[in-house]
Amino acid sequence: MGQLQERFKHYREPQKFMEADVYPYFREIEGKQGTEVEMGGHKVLMFGSNAYTGLTGDQRIIDAAKAALDKYGSGCAGSRFLNGTLDLHVKLEKEISKFIGKDDCLCLSTGFSVNQGVIPALLSKDDYVICDDRDHASIVDGRRLAFARQLHYKHNDMADLERVLQKLPQEAIKLIVVDGVFSMEGDLANLPAIVELKHKYNCSIMVDEAHGIGVFGKQGRGVCDHFGLTDEVDLIMGTFSKSLASIGGFIAADWDTINYLRHTCRTYIFSASNTPAATAAALEALHIIQQEPERIQALWDVTNYALKRFREEGFEIGETESPIIPLYVRDVDKTFLVTALAFKAGVFINPVIPPACAPQDTLVRYALMATHTKEQVDRSVVALKKIFVEQGIIK
């Protein structure tokens, strides 16, 4: 056995949870994702999905993907930089730019690769990147790859952000990178305050709208639109794997910035372009959310109902303002146990443990789709309350 393999010989943390029959990962779904799914012959209510608009099984999107597969084939066999650009990619970029309200955008193969590639491309060794403590892992990896000096501030603490900015040279390039909606806790970035600090300290802002698009703003344009601050935010990132029922991501900005990124962003230049089917699916989903505002209203109706029910039943749900509802457990082992018991009771939810949160902040993440019904919410709340009470988490 080599030295590398020797390092991992004693890594058995997952096996501890497997032996206790509470291991929650890599469960196989046997069919389309919807509000109910089949897993191992077991039907469960799906409250673990990021498909906020409920479009992943929509026949119009499936048909669009099939048509693209027939016309273009299964893949592009190259990067966008060389032989991998389809007219379909360009059409999606034009429509995303218009939808978001920016001059231009780039579409990449995953949302993760957007943050991983854009942040290093933008910044050099004399620049500064400033991030919220709870920014997504893709932002964390992006700033680690950048040569810029890396700073962070306490979660949504504007006084702490100002403390950080006060110490930086006024003339230096300073990029604040923040999630619009925080993916585990469901709260929103304080964009109005961040924009004020941008002007006070001569900064730029990049907002990750992965969990904001299809949820907030006019026709689901995101948190920047929700606050009326699209023009104040320099770069807006988004993903196609959540509300847009596909896979991929984008970065939208002014023409000059996108022109620069198109020729320097390594995850764009050196990755194969997104598949025709995935591109067509995202494009069709974008059309649907603009044509069907009632879909977003349905999402908010069921979200507000679920928030009310969880509060009434005594769950600790933090400061969420979105369809992401954190149900705090505050114990790692109990978080795994609650997840396993919920699955056995017919409710699929996701455990959130370190490093995604601090050990004292563990939770199960409950997320809603526009297609969920109040009856499904009620069934899940009843099942989860029984488990939380039995485990001594709530009374």
In which residue ranges do the predicted regions lie?
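Conserved N-terminal alpha-helix of the aminotransferase class I/II PLP-enzyme fold
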Residues: 63, 67-111
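Conserved PLP-binding catalytic core of the aspartate aminotransferase-like
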Residues: 297-304, 311-346, 356, 360-361, ...
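Active-site C-terminal subdomain of aminotransferase-like
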Residues: 201-204, 211, 216-321
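N-terminal "arm"/small-domain region of PLP-dependent enzymes with the aminotransferase-like
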Residues: 5-74, 203
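Conserved PLP-anchoring active-site segment centered on the Schiff-base-forming lysine
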Residues: 118-137
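PLP-dependent enzyme catalytic core of the Aspartate aminotransferase-like
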Residues: 59, 63-67, 71, 98, ...
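Active-site phosphate-binding strand-loop segment of PLP-dependent enzymes
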Residues: 151, 155-207
